[in-house]
Amino acid sequence: MSTDSKRYCIKTKHVAIICAAVVAVGLIVGLSVGLTRSCDSKDGGQGTTQSPSHLPPTSSPPQDQGVCPASEDESGNWRDFRLPDFINPVHYDLQVKPLLEQDTYTGTVNISINVTSPTQHLWLHLRETRITQLPVLWRPSGEQVQVRRCFEYKKQEYVVVEAEEELAPNSGEGLYHLTMEFAGWLNGSLVGFYRTTYVEKGQIKSIAATDHEPTDARKSFPCFDEPNKKATYTISIIHPKEYKALSNMPVEKEESVDDIWTQTTFQKSVPMSTYLVCFAVHQFDSVTRTSRSGKPLTIYVQPEQKHTAEYAANITKSVFDYFEDYFAMEYSLPKLDKIAIPDFGTGAMENWGLITYRETNLLYDPNESASSNQQRVAAVVAHELVHQWFGNIVTMEWWEDLWLNEGFASFFEFLGVDHAEKEWQMRDQILLEDVLPVQEDDSLISSHPIVVTVSTPAEITSVFDGISYSKGASILRMLEDWITPEKFQKGCQEYLKKFEFKNAKTSDFWEALEEASNLPVKEVMDTWTNQMGYPVLNVEDMRIISQKRFLLDPNANSSEPHSVFGYTWNIPVRWTNDNESTITIYNRSETGGITLNSSNPNGNAFLKINPDHIGFYRVNYEVSTWEWIATNLSLNHKDFSTADRASLIDDAFALARAQLLNYKEALNLTKYLKMEDEYLPWQRVISAVTYIISMFEDDKELYPMIEKYFRDQVKPIADSLGWNDNGDHLTKLLRASVLGFACKMGDSNALNNASHLFEQWLTGTVSLPVNLRLLVYRYGMQNSGNETSWNYTLKQYQETSLAQEKEKLLYGLASVKNVALLSRYLDLLKDPNVIKSQDVFTVIRYISYNSYGKTMAWNWIQLNWEYLVNRYTLNDRNLGRIVTIAEPFNTELQLWQMESFFKRYPEAGAGEKPREQVLETVKNNIEWLKQNRDTIRDWFFN
């Protein structure tokens, strides 16, 4: 599926002042929000075609208390979070009937169960859906067992079935059979089985589909909802005749039930985990390709958007064929479908044989979409294809090893796209997308290991984060480099063969790679998966290196929380000298560091440690070496690879932020930028310096100096590329980045161009160049937006059908420098007919990027927290993560407000880690400003 150790005290006399200030701020915000709501909300979106949706249900489905009432009975092992290992499903016969207009569905499931120990109770997962008839239970002999009662144990999301007598273990081939009838809602949520709507030729149409990962299959139907409870499925859907049904497997038969209903039954599936079960009822059109091995690869899409599925269809075929070759294993099912869901909570979901997508990640229109959209589609398509092997064929034993799914998909997606789009430099772009961003996350005390214990649905949901995905991908990249790509590939093939249709743990993967490489993979890699963080290597005399844990907070206790490895790592250190590249294993037991066996014994030539940032660590050279690097970048930056230029700058700014390097040395590296003309370094430079920019945004003395310096640095490349949307893929990405940075730094020429194009667009007669649209919407709105242009942009958002264009317009709307309009925009978040459920948190984040909206967005979250929890639930990871919009905060008052808010709502659900991380970050920001402002001011001043 496409993430705090210091204590801060406020002196007592300041508390009264702060309290008064907070009350005043709260009143002002509350009044402004209230006033603008009463004035503006009535005309939000008048006179436009509304994108339909539906509101959450006002109440839960009525409970049949006589069937399976809720109970606090804790007399059995259903008290435990995990299912017992002596009750295992073997096969599900599942029939579901959606009543689309009523927003409900009914169903029946018959589960064949293997019982290996005597028990009087069977329990399985169920949440929000209700049992409508007393369950029926049969022995392996076919004799019915009397059921005494059933009840829901809501604490662990179970339904418990109690038999009149003890069930003996079944022997031989015979199995118990449990039949349950159930009913549930199709509205109010983007998880489980749900309905959403879209417009076709002015008519509102419905589609119903499932989204089950990680623990939401239990919302659709009663099931043993753990990844190691694999079973086969025969699924049938009863649906209106004018609709079609899809599921994991091909259709076995379609039968008419009556004049209104058709029953579609699908072939029996291979053994799979509950979270991969999928079905959909739709009226879409399709585009099909055929794989080299003869498998149909079909994309289902709204009929009016059929042309936007062509690119995804082509990339699917190319990457699918590549992975069948690379993994030396044919795809396991007879077909592979993909479907674009109009309102979808995650980026995409790898359901076996029926992958579901958010529209932005599947549908690409070359005449309307940007190059970044095209790359996103390719990456997400490749990511979900990887899962058809890593995740579906071989599934992690338990969610603590989620990275075996997500880290692998995040790594191999770059190989897949690199195969299909060879000019995009995807093998290097992994630095921008995964390696360098997650190194920032993982340098906090509040990070977590890749392999982490989880024991609630909220904890499971919360590990779908940058550590599982991006750090997982990063260490696989390092591992592949160490043991060689050939042996890495062979090890992956052996792992897939050995655990086909089964579950595996991290240690199983290490074992497969050890057999393929004859190298101590487990000994090295356990230090990377079983403890959080990563090292910084300090280089002395150009050959002596020592390691220590890298933390952004220089005052943090680097031994906390406890790690069995003591925050030391076994490191495959790659280094180059005179164009020769070598790997030396730095054993963590060598506490005094190691000496590299360099052909340069005097240490007077540059020894590049970690070329192309292939290893998941940072490198700190002596000051004289950093000065040499800065000089040589200015003399001939092409002596360093594009990845090295990005890596050196990122390392330097991270080291300076952690007070391991003077900011003077880091900033000196940026002096060469007037000559830089490549995407990779520029994109990373912009990210690296954004921290400084955001910290000093409100500093009236320093910020203009920062703006002027970076404006001058970016001007040559911005002027050279200009505002014509031409060039290859990477040039288009580069242009969007540097022109955006020029606008952000207040370049009058860039801002005037953005405003001019924006004014032309407002006339309705000009189509903007696709790769400049986001820039124009953002900075045109920021520079010259008013109520008229804002209303026009909102109208365009509501009338356009392409999701990628909608997303850009949402960002434009969030960029207006007008508090009343931003307040009105925040009000629209509660109207799903205007802003889809999937986009609410995106909009809040966009508003927070606006200097006018930063505090407004945060205050809106606080004022509307209970509403958001009711709408999305505490288990929603997007809700959990939204608190991270406060990461740029850097005052004691802002910190106090955050801590007060978290105390008021202590239940964080999937937001537990994000809360820890944002508090740690804000505390670090406050301290950072005290420590670094003068140094940075002096550098820019001079």
UniProtKB/Swiss-Prot annotation:
Single annotated GO MF: aminopeptidase activity
InterPro entries hit by this protein: Aminopeptidase_N-like_N (IPR045357), Aminopeptidase_N-like_N_sf (IPR042097), ERAP1-like_C_dom (IPR024571), M1_APN-typ (IPR034016), Peptidase_M1 (IPR001930), Peptidase_M1_aminopeptidases (IPR050344), Peptidase_M1_dom (IPR014782), Peptidase_M4/M1_CTD_sf (IPR027268)
Residues bearing attached sugar chains per UniProt: N110, N114, N187, N314, N367, N557, N579, N587, N597, N632, N668, N753, N786, N791
Co-factor(s): Zn(2+)
Keywords, ordered alphabetically: Aminopeptidase, Calcium, Cell membrane, Disulfide bond, Glycoprotein, Hydrolase, Membrane, Metal-binding, Metalloprotease, Protease, Signal-anchor, Transmembrane, Transmembrane helix, Zinc
Subunit structure: Homodimer; disulfide-linked.
Name used for this protein in its record: Glutamyl aminopeptidase
Biological source species: Sus scrofa (Pig)
